[in-house]
Each structure stands twice: as C-alpha cells, then as structure tokens.
Amino acid sequence: IRKFHEAKVDNQKKVVVWGTGNARREFLFIDDMADGCVFLMKNFNPTKKQNEQGEIFYNLGTGKDVSIKELVELIKEVVGYKGEITWDISKPDGMPQKLLDVSKMNKLGWKYRKELKNGLAETYNWYINNKIDLKNV
C-alpha cells in the first residue's frame, strides 16, 4: 500500500513488484482475526479426548486465496495509482500457495466478515490518516 501511495504522490510511471505475481495467498483483516479468537474462547471447550487426539487446532482465515497479481491490482485500484506495474521475475515468488482449511471454524459457526478489497480500502484510509515518514524506518 505504501509503495503504491508513494508512487501516486510522486507521479511515478511504474511500480516494481517482486516475483511473477502467480503465487497465491490468503488474507484476513485483523478485526476478523480478533473476532475469531474471541469466538473460539467463547464457543470452543475441548473435551479431554479432543485434547489427547490433537483436535484442538483451528485455522482462522477466509478459506479463499488470491494471486499476488490480483492483490496488486486491488491495491492499485484502492490507492488510485494510474501507472503501470512491472514484475521483477529475478526475485522469488515464495511458496506457490498458502491457503487455510477453515471448515472446522465454519462448522462452529464462525466466518470472516470483511472482504479483501474492503479491508484494503480501510487499511489505506488508516494509512492516509496516520502515516509517518516510513522511508526512514
């Protein structure tokens, strides 16, 4: 977000992003993470058997992934950057996919609330209202 904001403000013609953009990642807004944790504390009381069998692990997530290309396009749109995106394929993509199985949380009755684009917009608004000179950090 910062990189695209600075490119917009400085009228840069392009933003360079590492990798091919093909890797896929899952993103969860922090408010949803907090809500999911509280939900588990209130609604999940494992039995001794569940504890012994290791059935106490729950993934908090959306269960949906996006490519880094899709993410970058969303950020570009949210920020209002009009330049081009250049992919530096000499840099690594990392793991091809990171996606959680959230079916156990869904069975308990919990689901995330904030869609990725809305979360990015909220994060960008926060950044605009609270930014500091991050170039020197």
Where are these regions (language model features)?
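Conserved AAA+ ATPase "sensor/coupling" helix adjacent to the nucleotide-binding pocket
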Residues: 3
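C-terminal substrate-binding subdomain of Rossmann-fold SDR/epimerase-dehydratase oxidoreductases
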Residues: 6-137
